[in-house]
């Protein structure tokens, strides 16, 4: 379990201020029953230190047995140092209300794991591969997976579609579509 301080901001005052802003914004979103979704939080990776990373999965309410839906997978921003999957809960709830499976990914960040963007990218690849291998469990179409993200998360989404494009790299993590919000690219 994480606290706001663990995942949002490196100092207590900043964490409390950011949490207040986010929770006030969430109140407006959650006021409508159409956008109220409780994600299923599923572990997709266990790290060497025993910590685990999770996918926050939002499923449409009107899914029928055996039906496959397209998915959109979000990666939060924060300079690979800070951030939380909560950043894209509003977007995930919106897409779930429109019939898509929406996922917000937890990945390693520098503040908690002393990691680099390279480890974050490995986590992003593992998240997509995990979703594809468990597609039937969540009724998602493994051939219709979009990725999205802002800033550092946009970098991860862009990298999933471009890095390792030669034939020696398995394409299980390659998205079918990328939606990039102000990505860090050169």
Segments the model singles out, each with a brief description of its role:
Residues 61, 78, 101, 106-113, ...:
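Short beta-to-alpha linker loops that shape the active-site pocket of alpha/beta-hydrolase fold enzymes
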Residues 67-78:
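Short beta-strand element of the alpha/beta-hydrolase
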């Amino acid at each position: 379990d994480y606290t706001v301080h663990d995942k949002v901001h490196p100092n207590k005052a900043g964490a409390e201020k950011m949490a207040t802003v986010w929770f006030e914004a969430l109140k407006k979103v959650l006021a409508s029953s159409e956008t109220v979704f409780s994600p299923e939080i599923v572990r997709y990776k266990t790290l060497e230190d025993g910590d685990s990373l999770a996918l926050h999965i939002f499923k449409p309410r009107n899914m029928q047995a055996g039906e496959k839906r397209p998915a959109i997978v979000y990666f939060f921003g924060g300079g690979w140092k800070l951030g939380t999957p909560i950043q894209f809960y509003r977007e995930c709830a919106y897409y779930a209300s429109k019939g898509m499976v929406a996922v917000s990914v937890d990945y390693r960040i520098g503040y908690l794991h002393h990691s680099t963007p390279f480890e974050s990218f490995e986590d992003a690849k593992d998240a997509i591969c995990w979703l594809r291998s468990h597609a039937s469990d969540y009724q998602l179409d493994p051939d219709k997976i979009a990725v999205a993200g802002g800033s550092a998360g946009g970098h991860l989404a862009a990298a999933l579609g471009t890095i390792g494009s030669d034939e020696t790299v398995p394409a299980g993590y390659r998205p079918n579509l990328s939606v990039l919000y102000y990505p860090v690219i050169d």
